[in-house]
Design a protein with these regions (language model features):
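Active-site-adjacent structural elements that line small-molecule/cofactor binding pockets in enzymes
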Residues: 1-242
Length: 242
C-alpha cells in the first residue's frame, strides 16, 4: 500500500471544490506531516501555517504499519523540488518516454541536494502500459484522456508538455477542442505522443516498454492487463515482471 497525494490545479481546486488553490505546496507539506504523525501513533497536536490542531487526536486502533510510503504526483519545478525533500516516492506526470531518463536523473539530483539518499525514493512510471488485444480502442481512450487533461484540467499539464518540446501538438489539440469539442480534440492528439506516454499493445510490446522505463530509472511500473481469465492474467504479469 502507498498513499498518493498531489496539489491538483487551480481550476479543479477553485472551480470544483470552491476553495483557494494557493498556497498549495504548503498545504501539501502539512498534509504529509500530519499523516505521518497519525500513523506513528503520536497525539495530533500540529502547529502549521495552515493547519492548527490542538485536540491530540489518535487513531483508536493500532495501525498494521506505523509508516506507509507517501508518493507525491508533481510536475512543476517547485513541486518536484518539494517532492524530493519530503516524499517517499515520486509520481511524475506527462513525461514522454524519450524525456524520461534526464527527468528522473534531475529528480534524483534534487534528492541528493536535499541531503537524502536517492536510492531510498521510488519513482513510479508516468504512464501506464496496457496489455490488450484491442489496441486501437485503448489508444483512442488514451487520446481522449490526454486531450481532456491538456484542455480542461488547468495549465500545469499543458505547460509540462510545452516545456518538453510539444508546443505545436498542444496548440493543435487546444484549437481543435475549442472549435470542435471533445471529439475534435481527441482526434488531434498525435499517435506518437500518446504512445510515448501510454502504450497499449501486445505482451511483447509492453515488456519492451517496461524494460525501457526501467533503463530510464523507473522503479515502479503502472500496468493494466485485459485478460479473459485470472490464470491468463497471472501468466502475463509474470512475463512483465520478467
Amino acid at each position: 500500500m502507498i498513499i498518493g497525494l498531489g496539489t491538483s490545479g487551480h481550476r479543479v481546486i477553485e472551480h470544483f471544490h470552491g476553495v483557494p488553490f494557493q498556497p498549495s505546496l504548503t498545504r501539501l507539506r502539512e498534509y504529509v506531516e500530519i499523516i505521518r504523525m497519525i500513523l506513528a501513533g503520536e497525539p495530533l497536536k500540529y502547529h502549521g501555517k495552515l493547519f492548527r490542531l490542538e485536540r491530540g487526536f489518535r487513531l483508536r486502533f493500532p495501525p498494521v504499519r506505523s509508516q506507509i510510503p507517501i508518493f507525491i504526483a508533481s510536475l512543476t519545478p517547485k513541486s518536484v523540488r518539494q517532492t524530493a525533500q519530503i516524499a517517499d516516492g515520486w509520481m511524475p506526470v506527462m513525461i514522454p518516454l524519450e524525456h524520461l531518463k534526464p527527468e528522473v536523473a534531475a529528480f534524483r539530483q534534487l534528492v541528493r541536494d536535499a541531503g537524502r539518499d536517492p536510492q531510498r525514493l521510488i519513482v513510479r512510471s508516468p504512464g501506464a502500459v496496457t496489455v490488450t488485444r484491442n489496441i486501437d480502442q485503448a489508444r483512442e481512450e488514451s487520446k481522449a484522456h490526454l486531450a481532456f487533461y491538456i484542455t480542461n484540467m488547468g495549465d500545469f499539464y499543458r505547460e509540462q508538455l510545452i516545456r518538453l518540446g510539444y508546443a505545436e501538438a498542444v496548440g493543435t489539440i487546444c484549437k481543435a477542442w475549442d472549435e470542435g469539442g471533445r471529439a475534435a480534440g481527441t482526434a488531434a492528439v498525435p499517435d506518437a505522443l500518446v504512445e510515448s506516454l501510454f502504450l497499449a499493445g501486445s505482451v511483447e510490446a509492453c515488456v519492451d516498454r517496461v524494460q525501457a522505463q526501467a533503463a530510464a530509472g523507473i522503479d515502479m511500473h503502472t500496468v493494466r492487463v485485459e485478460a479473459d481469465d485470472s490464470k491468463e492474467m497471472v501468466k502475463i504479469l509474470e512475463r512483465l515482471v520478467g
